[in-house]
Amino acid sequence: MKERLFKFKTFAGGTADITCHEVLEDGNLAELYHATGGNYGGTNVDEAFRQFLVKIFGTNVIREFKRLYLEDYLELFAIFERKKRLFDGKSDKVIFSFPYRLLELHESLCGVDIKRDVWNSPVGSDIEFPRGKISILSSQFKSFFDTTVSSIIQQVSELLENVPDLSYIIMVGGFSESPYVYSRMQERFGEMVFKPIEPSSTVLKGAVLFGEHHTIITKRISKYSYGIARMMRFKPEMHRLDKRKEIDGFVFVDDVFNSHIEVGQSIKVGQDVEGYEYFPATNGLTQAVLEVYASKNRNPRYVTDEGCFLVGLLTIDLSPYEDHRHWPLRVKILFGGTELTVDVL
């Protein structure tokens, strides 16, 4: 029986990857939708907490605290990291140790007691400073996650529209350890959401297993269109005038994106995509340089179009051949593994 599943993978660095695979009857995997993701991970929650501190103490105090007491600053965020991973959203308050030096520095630089400024701040009713600690209302602590979790839910919801009959959503990675993030995902997507016992180490274990059994993924979906920059005969009714180039009496159009693979195309791992023949534009060359480009668009016209970027250059030695114009370079792109391979025959 085939099963379709999303794998939602988050990293401590602040990014998230979402992939969709179908488990085939032989146990191998087929990619159903190209990997997607964005800048929504645990680091974004840390930044929300930092902005929260700025609202209380002001930008100058936080900057000076980091400069003068870097060890205390880092320890504060290390403590926050532990609380972030354990937070489930069920308690009324979140309480943890808070550096007294920050309170002293605020009073020294601002000349007022912190309690007065707290009450005058936008978040004054949500926090207290009892005996070397900080107490934050659960509703405020949830707000640190809100933007990031909402982005994740929106991304997964959009993917669900493209992939019907989904069986499971698997959460792995450091940010997936958060009970609050897990509960929000279950609240939105129901019982199809689950995570392994150790979501952080699962990523490493998966990488090791894939290294040993790299053929387990039998089909992938291309995230980009891939092609070769080329020149072709200029046709004024079709081509941009600024791309017109004359060589040895022949008129060409330059920078054409000659597509080998289209974004969203399903390709078997190790499959040779149909190749194309390329000819040097002039004789007397000792080398030919193939420019490999990628684009987020399905059918880009020129390699200079928005969304196109250079993947790599391939230099071909032409010295053994005398008549270059009549000696074609047949180029194939091998797609499907963790690397893109360009073969020239």
Please provide the spans of the model-predicted regions.
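Gly/Thr-rich phosphate-binding beta-strand-loop-beta motif of the actin/hexokinase/Hsp70
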Residues: 1-31, 49, 325-345
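Conserved phosphate-binding catalytic cores of ATP/NTP-utilizing and phosphoryl-transfer enzymes
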Residues: 1-11, 201-218
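Flexible loop/turn segments at secondary-structure boundaries
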Residues: 15-16, 176-180, 203, 235, ...
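Gly/charged contiguous loops adjacent to phosphate- or pyrophosphate-bearing nucleotide/cofactor binding elements
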Residues: 20, 24-25, 37-186, 235-239, ...
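Short beta-alpha connecting loops at secondary-structure transitions
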Residues: 30-38, 62-63, 190-196
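Interdomain boundary/hinge elements
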Residues: 60-63, 194-200, 217-227
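Acidic low-complexity intrinsically disordered segments
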Residues: 104-147, 158, 217-345
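Conserved phosphate-binding/catalytic loops in two-lobed NTP-binding clefts
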Residues: 183-208
